[in-house]
Curated annotation (Swiss-Prot):
There is a cross-link at residues 1-29 (Cyclopeptide (Gly-Asn)). InterPro entries: Cyclotide (IPR005535), Cyclotide_moebius_CS (IPR012324), Cyclotide_sf (IPR036146). Belongs to the cyclotide family. Moebius subfamily. It holds the Pfam family Cyclotide. This is Vodo peptide N. The keyword Disulfide bond applies. GO terms for biological process: defense response. Disulfide bonds join 5-19, 9-21, 14-26. The presence of a 'disulfide through disulfide knot' structurally defines this protein as a knottin. Probably participates in a plant defense mechanism. It comes from the Eukaryota. Keywords: Disulfide bond, Knottin, Plant defense.
């Protein structure tokens, strides 16, 4: 139920601050 960060992480890494990767989408911590 975490809000989506507006970023994908198909390479396994999120570049947006405060976001973590739950492949293939980044979620806010």
């Amino acid at each position: 139920g975490l809000p989506v960060c507006g970023e994908t992480c198909t390479l396994g890494k999120c570049y947006t601050a405060g976001c973590s990767c739950s492949w293939p989408v980044c979620y806010r911590n």
